[in-house]
């Protein structure tokens, strides 16, 4: 990709810089493209020109779910991106129709579609976004370039200082700098060097580790559902989960996870055993006898971390933080991608309303970005803090009361379509959390499920046949 030109000094040329060439960075660049003449993406590594692993993204080997709330946001920013994913082999799975899920209170029924999820490898997801974003001539990528520091003052960020792959140091100026560099972001340090106070920081660590392996899917499973067995945080045992995500090229990506004291290991001969050891063995049964296409990959960097940038007084002009640089979540919940997309939409919307150089734009964007972050954060840490050995701020009385209501809501969702719809609206980041406390939903929750709980996974006869004899097409 060609190198951007920062030599132009005319007063009318609007420039933006995005730190990080991952998904958050490309979405931020897409959000900026109608509001800046030149958008430079500063990326430390070389980006693949095809669906391939990206250096610095070890979590890409594990299951990633793009919930409908995030997919819609990405489609807003990059029209046609959903069709491109599907053409490349991704699956659009209806929810809850295409989901076989045991949550803490039991099996969910496969009601007609109210939401959806995009299922594919992270490599494919990222590549399509990168391909569509960089097709815009206003977006240029400066790869193999290290960001050294921010330029400017505590009142305004005016650009960045970088070191290129040949060792040259350069200053790039911009009207707006967006940090989308992910969980390794050094934004608090960069801002501190300019005299900006450090943001409040919070962590919740359940000690979760996760292990993944790719299998060749059985013949005839092109429309197989997403399968998931979740843990029950109310039990005083480590939380263990298993998930099968059907991905492109006739493969199943299987991810196991366990909190402190119950983590999966990296031994291939223990993978299926772990999958059978959770609350229901369906995932272990489904992968029995399948051809493994990869080794087991284990990741342990799963701490929930949040920087409250929106609370910093006198936030500098010209600087915004998005995506995992703001907050990272236990990946079991699959919210990181969707939150990044909704944060980029918040950036785009504020640019439309106020313009690139409007006073206090950055502070307004940072507050808007915090809204989807807060929802995903509460969903993640409210669950994780309950596990044995979890480290972090314990919930107060109000939070414990809310937890009891949510437990009752999850029980009701096992046999009540309207409650299931409200649950998926919130879980997919498609609706506000207030959807769970509307009068009709509260009344339904108080009454409880209208149907008896399922006693087995809600697989169809054909799917059951595949589960019992995975090498044969029923």
Named regions from a protein language model:
Residues 8-46:
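N-terminal Rossmann-like FAD-binding beta1-loop-alpha1 element of flavoenzymes
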């Amino acid at each position: 990709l060609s190198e951007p030109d920062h030599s132009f000094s005319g007063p009318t040329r609007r420039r933006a810089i995005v730190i990080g060439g991952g998904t958050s960075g490309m979405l931020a660049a897409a959000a900026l493209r109608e509001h800046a003449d030149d958008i430079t993406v500063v990326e430390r590594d070389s980006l693949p020109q095809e669906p391939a692993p990206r250096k610095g993204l070890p979590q890409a080997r594990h299951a990633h779910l793009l919930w409908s709330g995030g997919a819609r946001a990405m489609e807003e920013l990059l029209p046609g991106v959903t069709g491109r994913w599907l053409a490349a082999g991704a699956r659009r799975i209806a929810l809850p129709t295409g989901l076989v899920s045991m949550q803490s209170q039991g099996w969910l029924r496969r009601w007609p579609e109210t939401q959806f999820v995009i299922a594919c490898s992270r490599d494919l997801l990222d590549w399509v976004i990168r391909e569509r974003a960089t097709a815009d001539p206003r977006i240029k990528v400066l790869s193999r370039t290290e960001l050294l520091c921010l330029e400017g003052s505590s009142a305004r960020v005016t650009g960045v200082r970088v070191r290129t792959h040949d060792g040259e140091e350069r200053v790039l100026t911009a009207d707006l700098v967006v940090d989308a560099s992910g969980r390794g972001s050094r934004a608090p340090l960069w801002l501190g060097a300019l005299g900006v106070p450090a943001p409040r920081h919070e962590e919740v660590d359940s000690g979760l580790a996760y292990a993944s392996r790719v299998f060749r899917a059985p013949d005839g499973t092109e429309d197989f559902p997403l399968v998931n067995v979740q843990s029950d945080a109310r039990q005083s045992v480590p939380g263990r989960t298993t998930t099968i995500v059907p991905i492109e090229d006739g493969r199943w990506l299987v991810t196991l996870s366990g909190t402190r004291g119950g983590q999966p290991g990296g031994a291939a001969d223990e993978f299926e055993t772990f999958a059978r050891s959770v609350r229901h063995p369906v995932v272990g049964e489904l992968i029995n006898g399948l051809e493994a296409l990869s080794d087991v990959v284990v990741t342990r960097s799963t701490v929930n971390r949040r920087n409250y940038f929106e609370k910093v007084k006198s936030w500098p002009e010209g600087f915004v933080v998005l995506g995992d640089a703001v907050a990272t979540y236990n990946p079991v919940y699959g919210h990181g991608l969707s939150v990044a997309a909704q944060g980029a939409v918040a950036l785009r919307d504020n640019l439309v309303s106020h313009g690139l150089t409007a006073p206090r734009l950055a502070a307004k964007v940072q507050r808007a970005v915090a809204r989807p972050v807060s929802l995903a954060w509460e969903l993640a840490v409210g669950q994780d803090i309950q596990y044995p050995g979890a480290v972090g701020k314990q919930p107060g009385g109000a939070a414990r009361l809310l937890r009891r209501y949510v437990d009752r809501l999850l029980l009701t969702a096992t046999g009540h379509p309207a409650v299931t719809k409200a649950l998926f609206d919130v879980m997919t980041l498609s609706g506000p959390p207030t959807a769970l406390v509307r009068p009709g939903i509260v009344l339904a929750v108080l009454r409880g499920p209208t149907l008896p709980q399922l006693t087995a996974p809600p697989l169809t006869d054909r799917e059951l046949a595949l589960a019992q004899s995975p090498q044969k097409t029923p």
